[in-house]
């Protein structure tokens, strides 16, 4: 048996795919309990890997979908004695995947996975595009990313990812996971988070490009005051009229305030609103 710490169940972890395989039964049980898979639901796993979560989920339901980039792992799943007949396997990159092809009428997507940490943030931004068709998402992520997703205004972790995630979803941390739960162990702590897209957005933006732009401009200069961050777009008087304190820092602004600024800019800078952020 190999003594390498990057080999698990005969498969060598591929660094280019950011592979860290979960192998702690207690953690796996906690994740599956949080997902609570039920027969008939439209479940989708991103990056099933060697099946640590896939297998116990498969014991609860008859059919579900997996998306796997690593062709060797996809091949293993196709010939898996228990899972093979239950899985619809898409071999490819989840960041380019069109999740609308998995939509079933009256049966929203339930997406879960142990995401490669090197792509987790852009992948979540991709998934937010399908928020109307998603019931919930459960992801293993870097603990620092979960902290950012769940952060509140006025904290160091609060940033663009926070605002955009909370624009679309309720964010609920589920459990923390140590490096020892993986093969090979990552260099950081991990955590599981539940993201539940809103049926009705609490603070809808008229143009998401403006919301993204005010977030980028604010958080790229987070030590500056709001007045200085947005001086090219909004005057002190305009900020005050919108209920935004010009002397605050961007990290003190709420999601609602970012949306209010974005909507004002959309209404008053129609020509600019089509520009890419």
From Swiss-Prot:
SMART domains, alphabetized: rADc
The molecular function terms of the Gene Ontology recorded here are: 16S rRNA (adenine(1518)-N(6)/adenine(1519)-N(6))-dimethyltransferase activity; RNA binding
Compartmental location? Cytoplasm
Gene Ontology cellular component terms for the protein in this record = cytosol
Q: Does the keyword 4Fe-4S apply?
A: no
Question: Any signal peptide, and if so, which residues?
Answer: none
In terms of Pfam families, this protein maps to: RrnaAD (PF00398)
Q: Which reaction does it catalyse?
A: adenosine(1518)/adenosine(1519) in 16S rRNA + 4 S-adenosyl-L-methionine = N(6)-dimethyladenosine(1518)/N(6)-dimethyladenosine(1519) in 16S rRNA + 4 S-adenosyl-L-homocysteine + 4 H(+)
Main subcellular location: cytoplasm
Record SUPFAM superfamilies: S-adenosyl-L-methionine-dependent methyltransferases
Identify the keywords attached in UniProt to this record, alphabetized: Cytoplasm, Methyltransferase, RNA-binding, rRNA processing, S-adenosyl-L-methionine, Transferase
Q: What is its EC number?
A: 2.1.1.182
Job of this protein: Specifically dimethylates two adjacent adenosines (A1518 and A1519) in the loop of a conserved hairpin near the 3'-end of 16S rRNA in the 30S particle. May play a critical role in biogenesis of 30S subunits.
Q: Which family does it belong to?
A: Belongs to the class I-like SAM-binding methyltransferase superfamily. rRNA adenine N(6)-methyltransferase family. RsmA subfamily.
- Record's protein name: Ribosomal RNA small subunit methyltransferase A
Per UniProt, what is the name of the gene that codes for the protein in this document? rsmA
């Amino acid at each position: 048996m190999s003594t390498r710490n990057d080999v698990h169940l005969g498969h060598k972890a591929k660094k280019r795919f950011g592979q860290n395989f979960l192998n702690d039964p207690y953690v796996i049980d906690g994740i599956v309990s949080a997902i609570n898979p039920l027969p008939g639901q439209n479940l989708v796993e991103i990056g099933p890997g060697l099946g640590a979560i896939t297998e116990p989920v498969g014991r609860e339901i008859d059919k579900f979908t997996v998306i796997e980039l690593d062709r060797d792992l996809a091949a293993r799943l196709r010939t898996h004695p228990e899972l093979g007949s239950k899985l619809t396997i898409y071999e490819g990159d989840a960041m380019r995947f069109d999740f609308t092809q998995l939509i079933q009428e009256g049966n929203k997507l339930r997406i879960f996975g142990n995401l490669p940490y090197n792509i987790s943030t852009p992948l979540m931004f991709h998934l937010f595009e399908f928020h109307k068709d998603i019931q919930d998402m459960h992801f293993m992520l870097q603990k620092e990313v979960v902290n950012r997703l769940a952060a509140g205004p006025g904290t160091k972790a609060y940033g663009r990812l926070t605002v955009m995630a909370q624009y679309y979803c309720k964010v609920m941390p589920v459990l923390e996971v140590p490096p020892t739960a993986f093969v090979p162990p990552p260099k950081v702590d991990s955590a599981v988070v539940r993201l539940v897209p809103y049926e009705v957005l609490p603070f809808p933006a008229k143009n998401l490009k403006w919301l993204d732009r005010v977030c980028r401009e604010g958080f790229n200069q987070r030590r500056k005051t709001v007045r200085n961050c947005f001086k090219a777009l909004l005057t002190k008087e305009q900020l005050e009229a919108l209920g935004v304190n010009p002397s605050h820092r961007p990290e003190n602004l709420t999601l609602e305030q970012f949306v209010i600024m974005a909507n004002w800019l959309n209404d008053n800078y129609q020509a600019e609103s089509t520009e890419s952020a």
